Amino acid sequence: MATLEIEELAQSLQPGQAVAGLDLGTKTIGLAMSDLGRRFASPRTVIKRTKFTKDAEVLLAFAAKEKVAAFVIGLPINMDGSSGPRVQATRAFVRAMAEKTDIPFVYWDERLSTVAATRALLEMDVSRAKRAERIDSAAASFILQGALDRLSGLASTL
């Protein structure tokens, strides 16, 4: 199972299953995790990227440990709605991951997630050095929270 639409994910998730959020960058992968009720997203660790096989190994170990039912991955669409090279790289990453796992992926528009994460960290008076360490997982948390809010809205209409 490679990718699902958010509506398909809402129908396939069982109560008590957690969802992970990913902010895929060229140097890092920010991770976030939902609670079992899928109401809140919490930033987790940041994976320093090396090569795909190692990145996949670390990500799948995280998924096994946290019992991840699905991944919500930020899709870096341009502000004008067009797709650039980062969108292509994200889709290629998901295609490659689909060969290694049955855990489904959901693409989520990540426009302004890093801006929102940076603003939140600034408001919490996090130092510049700490912001650099935490920005990717904070962005993953914003991406995941957007998807969780949508899932919650879909659940109320089912």
UniProtKB/Swiss-Prot annotation:
GO terms for molecular function: nuclease activity. It comes from the Bacteria. Could be a nuclease involved in processing of the 5'-end of pre-16S rRNA. Coiled coil: none annotated. Belongs to the YqgF nuclease family. Its EC number is 3.1.-.-. One of its GO terms (cellular component) is cytosol. Keywords: Cytoplasm, Hydrolase, Nuclease, Ribosome biogenesis. The keyword Cytoplasm applies. This is Putative pre-16S rRNA nuclease. It is found in: Cytoplasm. It is an enzyme of class 3 (hydrolase). SMART domains: YqgFc. Signal peptide: none annotated. InterPro entries: RNaseH-like_sf, YqgF, YqgF/RNaseH-like_dom, YqgF/RNaseH-like_dom_sf. GO terms for biological process: rRNA 5'-end processing.
